[in-house]
């Protein structure tokens, strides 16, 4: 019996009795009984059941990554501080676009957030069609590219934030966070949010690769 069939019925018809040896038939013999035997259906668990659960989890993680990516972009993009004192020639002002590294950070995390938003329809397709291979393969490829971009931007910004906090005596770079405390706190928060986004992208890559595994 095939396990994928919903059920089958077996009909058994008894053979009529043979005629009397003397040549006389049995006139009053009842019609042959019909015996119907029904086999119980054996339902097979859907192959894509666990993959659908993975796809739903993928969708939720993407929403969280969008939130952290937008937070990193917004916090860094609005980072600015002006000290309440100034001299005749200088005004002490710090803004994210004073450093090309922070500008690259905003650009990269903005791209990552935009990509994650555009990837949501593909994630929904994976929920509707959990056995589809092409959408998951595309997600793995683009997730990897965006993850690399996000890690590069976060790492570069983290190096600048470290110098802002600690300085570098060999290069005569003084720490500025004692004066620009709010500026340093905002940039540090943005870098942490960006690293969280990169970690979620890494997890999404592993999740998609696991979902491509065949039963």
UniProtKB/Swiss-Prot annotation:
Homodimer and heterodimers. Residues 1-26 are annotated as: Disordered. GO terms for biological process: cell wall modification; cell-cell junction assembly. This is Casparian strip membrane protein 3. The chain crosses the membrane at residues 56-76, 102-122, 137-157, 190-210. Residues 1-55, 123-136, 211-215 are cytoplasmic. Its main location: membrane. Keywords: Cell membrane, Cell wall biogenesis/degradation, Membrane, Transmembrane, Transmembrane helix. It is a multi-pass membrane protein. It is found in: Cell membrane. It comes from Ricinus communis (Castor bean). GO terms for cellular component: Casparian strip; plasma membrane. It comes from the Eukaryota. Regulates membrane-cell wall junctions and localized cell wall deposition. Required for establishment of the Casparian strip membrane domain (CSD) and the subsequent formation of Casparian strips, a cell wall modification of the root endodermis that determines an apoplastic barrier between the intraorganismal apoplasm and the extraorganismal apoplasm and prevents lateral diffusion. Residues 77-101, 158-189 are extracellular. NCBIfam families: A_tha_TIGR01569. Belongs to the Casparian strip membrane proteins (CASP) family.
